[in-house]
Each structure stands twice: as C-alpha cells, then as structure tokens.
Amino acid sequence: RASARSKELMVRTWRPERDRHVVVVVDCGRASAALLGAPDAGADTIEIGVAPRLDSGIETALLLGALATRAGDQVHLLALDQRVRARVSGIRGGAFLGAAATAFQEVVPSLDVTDWQLAVSQVRATVRHPALVVLVTRVPPAGMDVDFLEAVRALSDRHTVLIASATDPDQDRARTDAEDVLMRAAAALEERTDQAGVAD
C-alpha cells in the first residue's frame, strides 16, 4: 500500500537485531589444562592440534567475539578460574579483536577448580539485560559438577546459555576402538565355546 501512495517503489528490508549482548566466559581452571590430541612419537616434530583445551577455548572466544562484533552486538569476554584472569568489555568495531588478543595473551591454564559462582556474579555485574552467555569449558559428566549445573541454572533464569566444548579426537577414537575390541573379544569367545561344544 505504501508503494501505491508514493511515486517510488517502497521496499521493506529485513535487518537482524543489533546491539544484543553476548558474554563469552572461558574456563581457565583445571579442565582447561588437559591436552587435546596425542603427542607424536618424534621428538623433533610438533603434532598439529596438540594443545591445552584452553587454547581451543580462547580461539572460540575470539571467533565468536569477532563475529558478534561484526554483526553489531556488544561483546564481553571473561577468562576465569578462582579469579578473573582477563576481561574485555565495551570495545566495538575493529579495535575489539586486538584488545581481546592482548587481554588473552597472558592467560594460562591453572590447576585450580573453576569457581562457577564467580562466573555467575561476573556475568550479572557485566550485563543487566538478557544476553547470550557462552560458557567455554569441558562439559562435566552428568551430575558430577554440581557447582557448574547450579551456575548454568542461575544464568538461564535471565539469559540464554550456550555451552561450547572441544572434544579430543584421540579420546573419541580410543572409545570406539575399545568398544570394537570388546565386541571382537566377545565374538571370539562365543565362537570358541561353540567349537568346544559347551552348551549355554
């Protein structure tokens, strides 16, 4: 109808929501110190992908931050364990990635257990409006880390919570290899009992 009243064609363009808040929390605690990948046997070579889980977490935070900043969102990055190790907040545009890389360059994994209540309080102090909160950590086995579950529950009352976790391809391969070995052993045992004439 607007085009009918105007001499020019009116077009409605869709533009995604902007100025949302995105908070990325990187776990620097004990879980982040685990190596992803297996070291190569050669002493003179470095296997690509063999690094602490923290490295993958920092890369995730930088990538998410750059994408969200480019989309026009307000990005806040936190790295913590028992205390806040790095924080980037309130920086927009092209300066964001440089500031984030500088803030994270001194962050190393610690052997402390991550204080997830600290993460909750830091997120609440950082953003007052509903936000997307990305927790970059190892997903604990079901029911094992009660503090983590309580933190996720507390954050999800007000925010949308996403958990990002890197998996170790060598552990996944070992898990499937172990299952395969057990299945073959069970089949071999079954075959031997059949050959021996042992009844069930």
Sequence positions of predicted segments:
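Von Willebrand factor
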Residues: 96-132
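Short glycine/proline- and charge-enriched loop/turn segments
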Residues: 41-42, 95-101, 178-185
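Short secondary-structure boundary/hinge segments and terminal tails
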Residues: 86, 122, 172-173
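An amphipathic, basic-hydrophobic helix/alpha-beta surface used to engage anionic
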Residues: 1-95, 130-137, 150-151
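Hydrophobic alpha-helix feature that most strongly marks membrane-spanning transmembrane helices
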Residues: 27, 69, 105, 109-112, ...
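Well-ordered alpha-helical segments embedded in enzymatic catalytic cores
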Residues: 60, 118-122, 147, 197
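Von Willebrand factor type A / integrin I
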Residues: 143-200
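Short, contiguous acidic/charged loop-to-helix segments that flank catalytic cores in large enzymes
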Residues: 49-53, 107-111, 134, 138-143, ...
